[in-house]
Amino acid sequence: MSYQVLARKWRPQTFADVVGQEHVLTALANGLSLGRIHHAYLFSGTRGVGKTSIARLLAKGLNCETGITATPCGVCDNCREIEQGRFVDLIEIDAASRTKVEDTRDLLDNVQYAPARGRFKVYLIDEVHMLSRHSFNALLKTLEEPPEHVKFLLATTDPQKLPVTILSRCLQFHLKALDVEQIRHQLEHILNEEHIAHEPRALQLLARAAEGSLRDALSLTDQAIASGDGQVSTQAVSAMLGTLDDDQALSLVEAMVEANGERVMALINEAAARGIEWEALLVEMLGLLHRIAMVQLSPAALGNDMAAIELRMRELARTIPPTDIQLYYQTLLIGRKELPYAPDRRMGVEMTLLRALAFHPRMPLPEPEVPRQSFAPVAPTAVMTPTQVPPQPQSAPQQAPTVPLPETTSQVLAARQQLQRVQGATKAKKSEPAAATRARPVNNAALERLASVTDRVQARPVPSALEKAPAKKEAYRWKATTPVMQQKEVVATPKALKKALEHEKTPELAAKLAAEAIERDPWAAQVSQLSLPKLVEQVALNAWKEESDNAVCLHLRSSQRHLNNRGAQQKLAEALSMLKGSTVELTIVEDDNPAVRTPLEWRQAIYEEKLAQARESIIADNNIQTLRRFFDAELDEESIRPI
């Protein structure tokens, strides 16, 4: 028997054999079971995800001799002929090779005839988006009202190219691209059934290279079996796909984490010798960094495909802080984005890794070295005249004080003091220009620079060669920190001050509000008759009264509790007793009941009523309406104030 490729040999024969696409299979199975069968189905999705296979399974379910079912028997003549591709009532058409309108018309001429053997005549049109505009127009009427014995199954990888009139006449099912784990699991199942030796990491590489297409994965598996001499090995798959193996990619990550630039460049040279795809190199490193981050979150995230490098991955996850992983990941991701703009792909990868090394948080930072400067001894007298004799030999050194100054420092300070004295004497004796002319010139700027350097050296003593410690790495602590929220300072801008002043009530308006509050609130009227200090009066204005016989209870707002004290209660009780003519027992409790208003709340309510009336009056004003209508003026309602 001739060899059959895996993609054809393992084509699904039942709905249960289809990998993924549960959302499509469930809808089709329910429709077949309930007998709710549409006359046109459209399957869309990327290549190799099962569009044609599902369409054939649907045709098998429609024409199985056991009846319309979601689980065809697979043994009757109709099922076997559909599997073998020779069922007379399943007409498969490649629209890419039959795009002319004449081909479509010839096809539609046979639609009216009943099926020869099956229950339905099924037209399976693959790559239907390749049909011409005239072909779509010819198909339109038949697709809208086909005979009862005709079903259309359309498959396309580009549904956007189909006319909306075609889309509206079909049930649309979009097949999703398979994820890497689904493809890897199916490859493992097939290779186990075929008794072919394989490595988990090799299957992971094949599943990732398939990019969501199971057919591409099976084709690559056939190629890997041929490359690996009858088995699927990681080395053969890496060489076939032009990708790095785990050890090399992981070694690059380790060298980058250790800030070992020489090791990184050596590994780059090894990768170049293998002729790998440079973007694939960055993708592999990004994948490893992602796995390391996932292991830090959940130790069980490392799958069986990483068994060969599991220990090294867990060690990296243990030692690298999460912030470093995010830094490396973002650096490599940006490098991959900028790779097309690099003069050379290898150059772009090298610069990306060098950027990661440059931003390494543990790079050694050498301490700044202060150069040790030595100065020649300066004589105490900085200004010499020609009549002076040569300096005498220095006397024996005296005993140093308790806190000695450096010799150079003391000499420079003495020279500066002598210079100041000489300058003062020169100003006083301007009548002796001859002696000043014969004197040796003094470099004032040099002495000032020397003194400033000496002051800095004195303020920060230079460690000796024996005490100088080697350069230390930057202190880098990996610990969770909660940033202290800084309080936003309130800045009083002129605009804010103006707005606040606009809301201030004028004395006339405040008096008018108080008078109207007295008319509406008996307690406000009673407070106006009391002779109280201003601070005690605020207690009464911020409370509402509850009275029974000679007992008065004031319900004070909690925001004004600071006004409530024994002295205020005593003065308020005396004023109430004097007004009533008998002794009043006063109690004050805190109460924020909004149903009862205090005198101040009455004033605010009256103010808001007047403000609403003023706003309505201005809006209804004829002059204002004319300005807004003819000059497109805008009314600033926030500036409206009652008078």
UniProtKB/Swiss-Prot annotation:
Gene3D superfamilies assigned: 1.10.8.60, 1.20.272.10, DNA polymerase III, tau subunit, domain V (3.30.300.150), P-loop containing nucleotide triphosphate hydrolases (3.40.50.300)
InterPro entries linked: AAA+_ATPase, ClpA/B, DNA_pol3_clamp-load_cplx_C, DNA_pol3_tau_IV, DNA_pol_III_gamma-3, DNA_pol_III_sug/sutau_N, DNA_pol_III_tau_dom-5, DNA_Rep/Repair_Clamp_Loader
GO terms classed as biological process: DNA replication; DNA-templated DNA replication; viral translational frameshifting
Signal peptide (residue range): none
Annotated Zn(2+) binding sites: 64, 73, 76, 79
Binding positions (ATP): 45-52
Top EC class for this record: transferase
Assigned keywords, A-Z: ATP-binding, DNA replication, DNA-directed DNA polymerase, Metal-binding, Nucleotide-binding, Nucleotidyltransferase, Transferase, Zinc
Annotated GO MF terms: ATP binding; ATP hydrolysis activity; DNA binding; DNA clamp loader activity; DNA polymerase processivity factor activity; DNA-directed DNA polymerase activity; identical protein binding; metal ion binding
Catalytic activity: DNA(n) + a 2'-deoxyribonucleoside 5'-triphosphate = DNA(n+1) + diphosphate
GO cellular component, one term: DNA polymerase III complex
Residue ranges, annotated region (Disordered): 385-404
Disulfide bond listed as a keyword: no
Enzyme Commission number(s) of this protein: 2.7.7.7
Pfam families attached to this UniProt entry: DNA_pol3_delta2, DNA_pol3_gamma3, DNA_pol3_tau_4, DNA_pol3_tau_5, DNAX_ATPase_lid
Keyword ATP-binding: yes
Tree of life domain: Bacteria
Protein family per UniProt: Belongs to the DnaX/STICHEL family.
Self-association state and partner proteins as the record states: The DNA polymerase III holoenzyme complex contains at least 10 different subunits organized into 3 functionally essential subassemblies: the Pol III core, the beta sliding clamp processivity factor and the clamp-loading complex. The Pol III core (subunits alpha, epsilon and theta) contains the polymerase and the 3'-5' exonuclease proofreading activities. The polymerase is tethered to the template via the dimeric beta sliding clamp processivity factor.
Function: Part of the beta sliding clamp loading complex, which hydrolyzes ATP to load the beta clamp onto primed DNA to form the DNA replication pre-initiation complex. DNA polymerase III is a complex, multichain enzyme responsible for most of the replicative synthesis in bacteria. This DNA polymerase also exhibits 3'-5' exonuclease activity. The gamma complex (gamma(3),delta,delta') is thought to load beta dimers onto DNA by binding ATP which alters the complex's conformation so it can bind beta sliding clamp dimers and open them at one interface.
Protein name as catalogued: DNA polymerase III subunit tau
Species this chain originates from: Escherichia coli (strain K12)
Lineage: Bacteria, Pseudomonadati, Pseudomonadota, Gammaproteobacteria, Enterobacterales
